[in-house]
């Protein structure tokens, strides 16, 4: 069974409006809870790097396990 994560980004549009963008990512299953926590932490770091790389103006973002 795979691990599914829900990513929500509150993006700030050029006119000042805040729009929520959602995405689901499915990653391979882990054998332990510690592995799942590590996978979640790595995903949060990857999302942060992607937002900085693409210079997306955002108010906040959340990553949760579905």
Question: Language model features by range: what are they?
Answer:
Residues 2-22:
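Short aromatic-glycine-(Arg/Gly/Cys) micro-motifs in beta-strand/loop hairpins
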Residues 6, 33, 37, 41-44:
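Short linear motifs centered on Gly/Pro in flexible linkers and helix caps
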Residues 8-12, 25-27, 58, 63:
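Assembly/interface hotspot detector across virion components, adhesins/toxins, and nucleic-acid enzymes
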Residues 14-16, 28, 54:
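Short linear/disordered segments characteristic of secreted peptide precursors
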Residues 19-38:
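A short, exposed loop/beta-hairpin motif centered on an aromatic-Gly-Thr core
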Residues 41, 45-66:
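Short, mixed-charge low-complexity intrinsically disordered segments
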